[in-house]
Amino acid sequence: MANIKSAKKRIKVTETKTLNNRMIKSALKTVIKKFEAAVAGNNVEEAKTVFVAVTKSLDVAASKGVVHKNMAARKKSRLAAKLNAMA
């Protein structure tokens, strides 16, 4: 356990940031699964609307540093390819 005041603060801050990052990642995974389900069900209209949400979520996560920007770009590219294959 930390004895120095700044170390104690860092522990609190790290726990808070970890929780926020976990929430963002969880929401991201949920919306990606929703998109995958729409693609699997051949629901083009729903897939298009969910794709916009996926793109926004990936951009937010990348801008906040939760995921790497290249990972976000790769995911968007692969999901866009799936969407285009449906149409």
From Swiss-Prot:
It comes from Clostridium botulinum (strain Eklund 17B / Type B). InterPro entries: Ribosomal_bS20, Ribosomal_bS20_sf. Belongs to the bacterial ribosomal protein bS20 family. One of its GO terms (molecular function) is structural constituent of ribosome. This is Small ribosomal subunit protein bS20. Binds directly to 16S ribosomal RNA. GO terms for biological process: translation. GO terms for cellular component: cytosol; small ribosomal subunit. Gene3D superfamilies: Ribosomal protein S20. It comes from the Bacteria. Keywords: Ribonucleoprotein, Ribosomal protein, RNA-binding, rRNA-binding.
